[in-house]
Amino acid sequence: MYVLGIEGTAWNLSAAIVNEDDVIIERAATYTPARGGIHPREAAQHHSEHIGPLLREVIQGARDLGIKIDGVAFSQGPGLGPCLRTVATAARVLALKLNVPLVGVNHCIAHIEIGKWKTGARDPAVLYVSGGNSQVLALRRGRYRIFGETLDISVGNMLDKFARSVGLPHPGGPRIEELARNAKEYIPLPYTVKGMDFSFSGLATAAAEAARRYDLEDVCYSLQETAFAMLVEVTERAMAHAEKKEAMLVGGVGANRRLGEMLRLMCEERGARFYLPERRFMGDNGSMIAYTGLVMLKSGVSTPIESSGVRPNYRTDEVEVRWA
Ligand code: ATP
Ligand code: FE2
């Protein structure tokens, strides 16, 4: 079975075709804000300008390989409303034109499913950290339940905000990671875990404050150590609570080596296995939507056009996981 999937919840517009074995084609057009963070309408404008050429390229690629597309998947949410609508409109038209089923995919679940596909993880506790989301999830009674999540901003958003406040370019995460490597000392910053949830906005403010008095390298390092320790603590507690013997890291912040290392150590100490997908499957990509659409279609789930409206606040636990 071949499924074409379109991702476009935020900055990255990406379309891909996958089958059960592999990614066949993937193409992307990335929106980079001229200054500051993402502007939802500008991002949507970017997506509508690029979606035609992008889809034409992917469909032509399929034709050249003699592939017949059996379904169209799209990121239905969560994400920025204007971006989601652009993608959903294109997906509906394409499904009608090709006369194949349409399937709306939960973006967070897609991060998890492609991670499992590409690493061989079976039933992990998942730390999903990106610019828009920070959650700890695990499958229980047929749904991806959220065990812990941020009470305010996501960890990626916190890193990007801090970066902006000290004059570093967007996205801040990679630059902070680089600077942190040259640090000499740890500066205490507020560590906030409440029950199973974490909070990052106070940390961003405290770090910006500290950057006026201390070396930027030391602040970047301390910011990472503090924020990541919070994430690792909650992931470990979710593993204990949900009795999971595996952990997996997904989302754009998952590219951070230090975060991966901290999770790996925690897993080693618990005698659990740690899974880290390749970088290209960690951030937002079309293949994750195509692949999740494929497993959904194979389990008999599709989305009729009349219920294919976008869902900017779509939660993972709203989806019944029939394919696991
Ligand atoms: P989502 O829609 O799932 O919320 P997103 O639109 O934020 O995703 P991602 O690619 O998943 O996109 O994540 C982008 C975030 O990842 C940014 O906040 C960026 O700073 C962060 N990031 C990227 N590389 C690193 C890194 N090496 N270390 C820390 N953070 C990173
Ligand atoms: Fe994402």
From Swiss-Prot:
Q: Which HAMAP family is this protein grouped with?
A: Kae1
Spell out the subunit comment. Monomer. Component of the KEOPS complex that consists of Kae1, Bud32, Cgi121 and Pcc1; the whole complex dimerizes.
User: What are the EC numbers?
Assistant: 2.3.1.234
Keyword field contains Amino-acid biosynthesis: no
Q: Its encoding gene is what?
A: kae1
Q: Any keyword Nucleotide-binding?
A: no
Q: What is this protein called?
A: tRNA N6-adenosine threonylcarbamoyltransferase
Please explain the role this protein plays, according to its UniProt record: Required for the formation of a threonylcarbamoyl group on adenosine at position 37 (t(6)A37) in tRNAs that read codons beginning with adenine. Is a component of the KEOPS complex that is probably involved in the transfer of the threonylcarbamoyl moiety of threonylcarbamoyl-AMP (TC-AMP) to the N6 group of A37. Kae1 likely plays a direct catalytic role in this reaction, but requires other protein(s) of the complex to fulfill this activity.
Q: Where does substrate bind?
A: 128-132, 160, 173, 177, 256
Q: Which UniProt keywords apply?
A: Acyltransferase, Cytoplasm, Iron, Metal-binding, Transferase, tRNA processing
Family of this protein: Belongs to the KAE1 / TsaD family.
Checking Pfam families in the record gives:
TsaD
Q: Which GO CC annotations does the UniProt entry carry?
A: cytoplasm; EKC/KEOPS complex
Cellular compartments annotated: Cytoplasm
What InterPro entries does the database record attribute to this sequence?
A: ATPase_NBD, Gcp-like_dom, KAE1/TsaD, Kae1_archaea_euk
Q: Name the cofactor(s).
A: Fe(2+)
One of the GO BP terms on file: tRNA threonylcarbamoyladenosine modification
Cofactor binding comment, as recorded: Binds 1 Fe(2+) ion per subunit.
Q: Which GO terms describe its molecular function?
A: iron ion binding; N(6)-L-threonylcarbamoyladenine synthase activity
